[in-house]
Amino acid sequence: VRIGLLTEGGYPYVSGDAGLWCDRLVRGLGQHEFDIYALSGSERQEDDGWVSLPPQVQCVRTAPLWAAEDDGVVYGRRARRRFEECYGALAAALCKGGASDTSADSSGAEADRFGNALYGLAELARDEGGLVGALRSEGAVRILERACRAPGALRTAHEARVPELLAVAGHLERALRPLSLDWYEDDGLGAVDLCHAASGGAAALPGLLARHFSGVPLLVTEYGVRLRSHYLASNAGPAHESAPAVRALLAAFHGRLAAEVYGQAACVTAGNAHARRWQERCGADRAKLRTVHPGMDASRFAEVGESPDTADPHTLVWVGRVEPAKDLVSLLHAFGEVRKGEPKARLRIVGAPAGAEGAAYLGHCKALAAQLFPDEAEGPHAVGDNPVSFEEIGAPEAPTLAEAYASGAVIVLSSVVEGFPIGLVEAMFCGRATVSTDVGAVVEVIGGTGLVVPPRNPRALAEACVALLRDPERRTRLGAAARARALELFTVEQNVEAFHGIYLEIVSRRPITRLALDATGDPQPFAVPAEAHLPGHWAKTEPPAGATAVSPAVEAAR
């Protein structure tokens, strides 16, 4: 099978999102051919270069999302009219709100209008050579303004001023850049058997257009739902970009785009049930949804997982990226309660800060730990020691990630916000008992192999930790069960095998019949066998339970 792998800001670049799982997927499926179509996220990412590519990668085509030169295309009167109609329909659909903001009938009509406008713009870009100049023009801003002022538009859209309109128009121009690419010809995405978008949003746009122009089926994988990410980041920009009108219109655009992607995809995979619920909320058909857990390398934790008795029985370990969402403050307060019941308990916090905010938060946590737990000494002549330590991977105390997990009897996760808890899976690979807060996909990942408590509840967190510290046999049982669960569900091998099966299923259900031409350009006879169009059920079917088999003689008499 020839796969067109679509990425945004990741593979095959050295830096970026989702690069590791894409690389493992491509390397693990050596029986397939891969064409990589990558949208880069920054100039620095392009300068960093690519990872080494395996031989099954046939070609790589890239395009920058962070910059686009003016294509120099000047539209004639007819092309301008087509652009005004399509862009006007797109803007009108956005001004009516997102996919979940209206009634079912009107929402379906607006979804059709959005999809038709999107494909109309793509066809215009294909015919005229690009959309960049038109999307950056003053005419595009005026079209957007008319849509915002039209009767029936969102109230927040009516309030959009010139700076807000310019911000929305600029965002739409960047988001629609894939429409102007030359990837959709017969020697590009039109030649693949299946498009696999490694995320939603811009990465899935080329897959939508390949389906529109060439009938190529689309598979979409989301380990983090792009629409949710947009919602979380919508307040982080400058004032004119976080105004209510801008947020409403851009949320409508991303919501409509997500609904169109989910509607046209042959299959949509989520990394966990949390992401799957978001996909259903955004319009994905439940029949198309599959859960494929992220695949992680278990080999580096094998030695620790097979030697569960190496841990200090009094040590709690937290491992992760230091930032406010990890709620280390609650963990420190909980550890104060733990020390009341288990005076020998120690807490190791292993991780580096995430940016300036993380560094400030780490400083705050260190000050709080010094205040809550003054240095203690065993005797009058001994040196005082703090029961809480802050370390980083690579330091003498924690040379490797596996050794950090190995040092603890109980691994603690105290987050208030979490997507897929990678650190929790790593602890499970190590065969360690865990105490986690009920956020994100924690319950789905841990199952019944660890203790789960409400977030922002230091007392509940402390009680769970004390219960495990006092019961070594229970820790051993939970650790063994957690390791078995992780090896069954979260390895690279199961992830690769799941996608291999999905590829074959999609291609078998939606085969592409292309017109085969000979050297002279004439149709090649017998290129497609007649049985390719023969209707029938090719899968073996079993009679329903309790049914009576009919003999051939009786069937002939009928």
What are these regions (language model features)?
Residues 242-244, 362-399:
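Nucleotide-activated donor-binding/catalytic signature segment of Leloir-type glycosyltransferases, i.e.
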Residues 451-458, 467-473:
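Conserved acidic donor-binding segment of nucleotide-sugar-dependent glycosyltransferases
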Residues 300-337, 346-353:
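Conserved donor-binding/catalytic core segment of Leloir-type glycosyltransferases
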Residues 439-452:
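Short acidic/histidine- and often glycine-rich active-site loop of Leloir-type glycosyltransferases
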Residues 402-408:
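Short alpha-helical donor nucleotide-sugar binding micro-motif in glycosyltransferases
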